[in-house]
């Protein structure tokens, strides 16, 4: 501690930097820790009979030194009072009897002994240990600045480097700041404000919906979607705010345009009246009026930039600006068009508006309404002064000005006549063009209908041809099946053994040898030796007489059945084959085929041929009629009706000998 009192405090550069600029209390305690621990160890070694639960007490009359007065005897205490007298500080290292034990172990836990012991161990003026100050610190309090007075060297370094006296600090000492309430505690009182009842929510929805309806009805605003009163009030309010901002921007931009145009008109008028700088600004306002749409984006950006700067404009100020702008506009009209104003000029001379509009159109919009420059624009005077003079002359009803008025009236009448003639010609040409367009439209419609009709006819023709081909195919299949059934003959393939004979029923097939069929090409085929095969109508080229085998009765019955069915359906069926519509149904064909097969099987079972193979099949040729020709003819007749000119190819009778097996 003697080194500390002399100002020989050993600190590194970084620690000095922290002390100098930040007064870091933790760094200071860390720097003093080793010195304080060393002194504490020396005191414990000097006392042999010590107890750990006692406090260290010292006698104030021993090892008392005077604290040096660095600041001229004016040192601040911890309480902020000035002490001119030297204060006695107990330093164990500077005591006279430092070798003897100079501490007493006191069991009392009084505040005075505690304060004395801490003062002796720390070396601070009446303050506790820096460790205890750190632990028992009151919120908001700081380390007393006058503690640096105990270290003259350190205090001098601070004062020399920074030029400030840290013993006189303006910071309040031992201040206490009350803790702030938590966020939840503050919200508990206003919790009802954050809870919205269903009635309040519906009320907000009704209010926002009413505002939206007012915007739509008064200003024809187009909403982003269709809203109802049952929608979310937050969405309704957001939509209303968006539409309101859009409309506010639009109206404000229009107001800016009006202000800009009035400024330009005023500048042009002043330049024409005084002309101090010889600047040619004639018809500048007309050019600005024609190009005003080009300034919409820039004026919108200006509005977006400054709309939140000055806050929302009061409605009174806005109304005042509107009245001022109206007055300025009226003043300009009175100045330009005389005492009567624009209404009197228009009433007395209607062509003034046409002339002004012609001048505007000539500036930048002349080619938008027809391409050619209007006649009124050609008659327009060259400058504004001539317009003012003409208007003043017209307003003055002097005798000398009557001639000029009559001339102007004559010119206006001539201009009106030319314009009426042009309008009549234009109306006639428009009428002719409309009539020609109507004729072209009718002709186009007629051609389109004709093309559609041709396409429909071609489609129907293709469908009819396809249907006829299907019917022809079905007819051929049906005739082939009938021919195959008619040419089938029962063959005695099985020999009937006697009842008494022990005969195994094994079939003895006739003509089952391959050699009987595949004979020599130069000789007559061997299967012709079989009498039954030789007498067949296919081999012998003899017509098949259906009456001999009972087919006539069968086809007669079929004809009667078809007639009865045709009477029920209202159609005529001839010969059992004319009703070709019945061939479209596969179920009817299958049922008829099953009936035919069953009848033929019954016939073969009842009428077995005799054993004499020489008997011809068509024995009763003279007593029967040729049915196949009539059957084929009747079948082709109905198909020929549908195919028209193709009937001649189908009328040829189909002979049984050419039926393909």
From Swiss-Prot:
Keywords from the named record: Coiled coil
User: Which InterPro entries does this one have?
Assistant: DUF5767
Residue spans with biased composition (Polar residues)? 118-130, 607-622
Q: Which Pfam families match?
A: DUF5767
Which segments does the entry list as coiled coil?
23-51, 198-226, 435-485
Stretches with biased composition (Low complexity): 69-84
Q: Where is this region: Disordered?
A: 55-132, 396-429, 558-577, 604-661
Basic and acidic residues: compositionally biased ranges? 400-412
Please report the name of this protein according to its UniProt entry: Uncharacterized protein R449
Q: Which organism is it from?
A: Acanthamoeba polyphaga mimivirus
